[in-house]
């Protein structure tokens, strides 16, 4: 929603994985929220600390999704169903709608659970759980994208 927890973590983790795979010239990675509450802010300090514990630096500044992003990017991934619905409302045609899906569609362990839980109102354990989900999903996303050339 506000682009300070889950999506900037996914951005940073995916960027790190892509760099380590030497595929960084193949991807343009961006993160944004569906609401503008935190525009210009760094990610939540608890999320940054969790990422730092795993060797990931989160320096992204929050921004809000724009309608033009749906033209500019090949894939738009939402962290939960509420964000998915909000992003779909911005779509102006079938091509844009087809780009939008849930991030955890790429999680091999997401049996019956399609959303990345929002850790914002919880404790440190929730941030670690989100990190594990995002890291696993980001790795599988890269494999899918480089193997199947979506």
PLM regions and their residue ranges:
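Phosphate-binding/catalytic loops
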Residues: 75, 81-150
């Amino acid at each position: 929603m506000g682009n300070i927890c889950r999506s900037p973590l996914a951005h940073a983790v995916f960027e790190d994985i892509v760099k380590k795979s030497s595929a960084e010239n193949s991807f343009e990675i961006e993160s944004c929220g569906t609401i503008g509450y935190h525009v210009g802010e760094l990610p939540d300090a608890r999320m940054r600390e969790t990422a730092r514990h795993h060797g990931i630096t989160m320096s992204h500044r929050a921004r809000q999704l724009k309608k033009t992003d749906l033209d500019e990017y090949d894939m738009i991934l939402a962290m939960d169903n509420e964000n998915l619905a909000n992003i779909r409302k911005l779509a102006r045609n079938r091509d844009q709608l087809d780009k939008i899906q849930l991030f955890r569609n790429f999680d091999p362990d997401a049996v019956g659970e399609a959303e990345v839980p929002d850790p914002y109102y919880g404790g440190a354990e929730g941030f670690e759980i989100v990190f594990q989900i995002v890291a696993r999903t980001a790795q599988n996303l890269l494999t899918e994208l480089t193997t199947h050339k979506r």
